[in-house]
């Protein structure tokens, strides 16, 4: 699965299927406000799962795989779930969901990871803003179902922006998996009592060397100096920028300044955190770094985000 609505040939699975004895199955799930509008605060019991219907779509798909994949030559007792980018984070989330126990047996998170879902106090606040922006009261909540999807997305977008302006809530995590402690445990994934029912499976975490390559759209940055990279990073790292660049240059002496810049922007801190958390379950955990650079634009693209697909 991927975490967005994009379509690429790489997601079709044909090439993966050619490489070994596997049955490849891609899935769909609801995204954004359609899949993750938490209305449980205003809708009560009837809307208790509303903040996670996108993840529940994935669980439903995995149940279908469990019940039907043998008809296609697959093994329901040997299911690997794999996702890339936002889909990698979704894989981490699925691996923390009690409902996935027995449905998945291995997991692979590519160029995306997480160790926790969004705080429900925050997501419920966004739900209140959605209702207000739609001009509805709590007793009229069911009318949201009749709003055309395009109109609803616009309503949710406006509500999200107003909530950010009023509450300072990050728009990036507004519409994503919710730690409702019902479908998705609260706290750090794979740890604590609330995660005792989560799947305990081996997992691979992988990122690319140059996830966020600053010179993809600007060839002139190929000639940037190490001092130039330091200056570019000062707004983000302040006085530590110089020591960070020097540390990367020492560890990777064969890399050019622009490559070092890309690698710093592509920090693996969250991946390491997720892998260490998963390791506590006692199953094998592997961390990989994808470095193959496709011969595109005079090799300027390097190992960019999505190239691992």
Locate the predicted segments by residue.
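Active-site rim elements
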Residues: 47-52, 113-118, 189-190, 250-265, ...
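Cap/lid segment of the alpha/beta-hydrolase catalytic domain
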Residues: 1-59, 63-71
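Alpha/beta-hydrolase fold nucleophile elbow
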Residues: 65, 72-85
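Short glycine-enriched nucleophile-adjacent loop
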Residues: 88-100
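Alpha/beta-hydrolase-fold catalytic nucleophile elbow
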Residues: 28, 82, 97, 106-111, ...
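Loop/turn elements at helix/coil->beta-strand transitions in domains of secreted/extracellular proteins
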Residues: 19-25, 75-79, 100-106, 199-202, ...
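Mobile gating loops/cap/lid regions near enzyme active sites that modulate substrate access
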Residues: 269-309
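Substrate-access "cap/lid" subdomains that shape
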Residues: 67, 101, 110-228, 259-276, ...
